[in-house]
């Protein structure tokens, strides 16, 4: 990716123009973004990846969030300065979307998708350092939040993800560092 053209993304021999550069601002084109997202989805998740028309409304909201279109976000009641909580039934593609969408803005800081249960397993092995590691820095999307077990380290029980989210909320208040999550819970 050339920094002079962050709206043009090269995947193999194909170039995807997601919008137009006007001055120092990118005017994104949602249909072009969908074309790119489907192509990138096939590269990341396999040839059967498909964006369905019924998913376009949520994709539009997520796209304007990720491209930081403050005006469009305001119109539909999204606060682009807060994190995303994406909920839905098992297998509907929440994790795939949170892994896919950052690719439309490769010039921005990217979050790391981490399964919440893996964090709890790490806590069981390594203890409270894990809460510190995830609670004090980094840009994360916690995947499948709410289905992880209670952590236990040397006989001491802990709601690991609850503690991490409290720490990350403090981080948000102090440094405006956003946290994303996916969940199957209502």
Model regions: which residues?
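A short, basic N-terminal segment
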Residues: 1-79
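Walker B catalytic acidic pair
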Residues: 143-145
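Hydrophobic anchor at the beta1->P-loop junction of P-loop NTPases
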Residues: 86
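Hydrophobic positions on the alpha1 helix immediately C-terminal to the Walker A/P-loop
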Residues: 97, 101
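Short glycine-rich substrate-engagement loop in P-loop NTPases that contacts/grips substrate
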Residues: 102-137, 152-158
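Conserved glycine(s) of the Walker
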Residues: 91-94
């Amino acid at each position: 990716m050339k920094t002079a053209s962050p709206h043009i993304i090269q995947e193999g021999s194909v170039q995807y123009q997601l919008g137009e550069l006007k001055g120092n601002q990118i005017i994104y084109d949602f249909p072009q973004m969908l074309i790119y997202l489907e192509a990138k989805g096939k590269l990341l998740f396999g040839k059967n990846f498909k964006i369905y028309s019924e998913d376009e409304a949520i994709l539009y909201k997520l796209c304007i969030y990720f491209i930081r279109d403050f005006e469009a976000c305001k119109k539909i009641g999204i606060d682009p300065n807060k994190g995303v909580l994406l909920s839905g039934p098992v297998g509907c593609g929440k994790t795939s979307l949170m892994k896919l969408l950052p690719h439309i803005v490769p010039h921005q800081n990217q979050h790391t998708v981490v399964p919440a249960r893996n964090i709890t397993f790490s806590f069981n092995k390594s203890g409270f350092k894990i809460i510190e590691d995830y609670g004090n820095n980094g840009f994360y999307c916690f995947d499948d939040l709410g289905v992880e077990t209670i952590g236990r380290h040397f006989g001491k029980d802990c709601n690991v993800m609850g503690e991490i989210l409290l720490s990350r909320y403090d981080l948000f208040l102090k440094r405006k560092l956003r946290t994303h999550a996916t969940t199957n819970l209502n």
